[in-house]
UniProtKB/Swiss-Prot annotation:
Classification of source organism: Bacteria, Pseudomonadati, Pseudomonadota, Gammaproteobacteria, Enterobacterales
An annotated Gene Ontology molecular function: rRNA (cytosine-C5-)-methyltransferase activity
Enzyme active site: C248
Catalytic activities: cytidine(1407) in 16S rRNA + S-adenosyl-L-methionine = 5-methylcytidine(1407) in 16S rRNA + S-adenosyl-L-homocysteine + H(+)
Matching CDD domains: AdoMet_MTases (cd02440)
GO biological process, one term: rRNA base methylation
Function: Specifically methylates the cytosine at position 1407 (m5C1407) of 16S rRNA.
Record-given protein name: Ribosomal RNA small subunit methyltransferase F
């Protein structure tokens, strides 16, 4: 593993931190925390495996796991060390059983569902690489719908890959500047997560170069963008809805001041809700307004800021956008065609709740769209909605990998459980020669009781059909990694 090089903290930045740091905290402790490597942390993906089953699974691996107090699915991995750079290639990760996610970044979603908030439609304004989107999907248990937006074109592909790997079925993706949503979908969402682009002062333990372009002038520019984003998000939020505003930075200009600015625009419609009781010991990071201002030395984590805001009344709408969305390219599958399609899918071991996911088509493509988003179709351009289920051919259907990962029954008659060695070959893109041979010709392949793909048996060979962009030459089991 590469040697950790502490960040060079500018004197002006340290002066700013000294001015805003609570008297209960020490600057010496702050500097010491910033110059320590960040603890590796993971989140169990409960769409694939329960926390209890995951802990039983990894118990033989010798992982030293410490629970993260604000996320019951989250754990610090205390003895990561050399395997830090290889956790992403473990079978357990490639199968979607866990997500490598910094502990502080689990806070916003925990705050979103604080007091067991019941949510139907959620917007994740800046979603890539997908840690929070997949965390929201798990908390929703794939019910309702999420719009996962990402402005950066280079990060959209990564976002989709993580959504697919984790078996998320209730998400639609958009590729916009987040400032469009308030006008395009006014007062539409039950909840919004705005993890805003920021100066990144809190991430120096993970990325020492994060401070290389730090300046007061850049913070002023970023804060102006953040005000635009939070204003648009507030307009897109239903009356009674909740918004989480978060950053991975520490200065007040990008944090408290942005929230107070929004409240000043809508004094009769915007309330702050305290996060003091979000988890045991949360009061150590709680401000007078009930925000969480997490300096890195408090919980030995990244620096972070989280605010929870409630929209208490409707607000005057923004002007409608001038652009044209264009004709929606999909149409619902006719009821008479749904029955044989559903029967064919079930025969293959693929099941879904027809009240949550609805069949749509485009040419020969069959898709499953979240029913909760139907009213948004045609009002905004989506880059991808739900799950591509199949392609229709004269002799039947070609079922898609992402549908199998999200919807297949690991206990179906045609399911075949892979050993560690065979699973490694599968994720390395190789054909497999298992013993004993499976009896079915079309197989749902599983690993640790979760579906990882669909394959054909040809004589004694399982033909590898894993999409090429998912192939990992270094795929290995976590147990094998622990032995090395």
């Amino acid at each position: 593993m590469a040697k950790f090089t502490p960040a060079n903290l500018p004197a002006e930045f340290l002066d700013t931190m000294r001015d805003i740091m609570p008297s209960s905290l020490s600057m010496d402790d702050f500097i010491a925390a910033c110059q320590r490597p960040l603890r590796r942390s993971i989140r169990v993906n409960t769409l694939k495996i329960s926390v209890e089953a995951f802990l039983r699974l990894v118990q033989p691996y010798g992982w030293q796991l410490e629970p993260i107090p604000w996320c019951q699915e989250g754990f610090w991995l205390l003895n990561a060390e050399e395997e830090n750079t290889r956790l992403g290639n473990t079978l357990e990760h490639l199968s979607g059983l866990f997500y490598i996610q910094e502990a502080s970044s689990m806070l916003p979603v925990s705050a979103l569902f604080h007091r067991n908030e019941a949510l139907e439609t959620v917007l994740d304004v800046a979603a890539a690489p997908g840690s929070k989107t997949t965390q929201i999907a798990a908390r929703l248990d794939n019910k309702g719908a999420i719009v996962a937006n990402e402005y950066s074109a280079s990060r959209v592909k990564v976002l989709h890959a993580n959504i697919s790997r984790c078996g998320v079925s209730n998400t639609a993706m958009t590729h916009f500047d987040g400032r469009v949503f308030g006008a395009a979908l006014p007062e539409y969402f039950d909840a919004i997560l705005l993890d805003a682009p920021c100066s990144g002062e809190g991430v120096v333990r993970k990325d020492p170069a994060a401070m290389s372009h730090w300046s007061p002038e850049s913070i002023t520019e970023i804060a102006a963008t953040q005000r635009d984003l939070i204003l648009s998000a507030f307009h897109a939020l239903k009356p009674g809805g909740v918004m989480i505003y978060s950053t991975c930075t520490l200065n007040k200009q990008e944090n408290q001041q942005v929230c107070h600015w929004l409240q000043a625009q809508f004094p009769d419609a915007c309330e702050f809700e305290s996060l003091r009781d979000l988890f045991t010991d949360a009061e150590r990071a709680t401000t007078e307004d009930g925000f969480l201002h997490v300096f890195p030395q408090i919980y030995d984590s990244e620096g972070f800021f989280v605010a929870r805001l409630r929209k208490t009344a409707s607000v005057p709408p923004l002007p409608r956008p001038g652009y044209k969305v264009g004709k929606f390219p999909f149409s619902p599958v006719a009821p008479k065609d749904c029955v044989p399609l559903i029967q064919a899918a079930r025969k293959q071991g693929i099941h879904w709740d027809e009240t949550l996911l609805q069949l749509w088509q485009r040419d020969s493509e069959i898709w499953l769209f979240p029913a909760a988003l139907a009213s948004a179709f045609g009002n905004i351009k989506f880059s991808r909605i739900g799950i591509k289920l199949a392609e229709r051919f004269p002799k039947g259907f070609r079922w898609q990998h992402e549908a199998v990962v999200a919807l297949a029954d690991p206990n179906a008659n045609n399911a075949y459980a892979l050993t560690d060695d065979i699973a490694c070959e599968w994720f390395q893109g190789k054909d497999c020669y298992p013993e004993p041979l499976p009896t079915a010709d079309e197989l749902i392949l599983t690993y640790q009781n979760t579906p990882v793909g669909l394959a054909k048996r040809i004589n004694s060979r399982i033909k590898n059909s894993l999409p090429r962009d998912l192939v990992r030459d270094g795929a290995s089991s976590a147990q094998q990694l622990a032995k090395e």
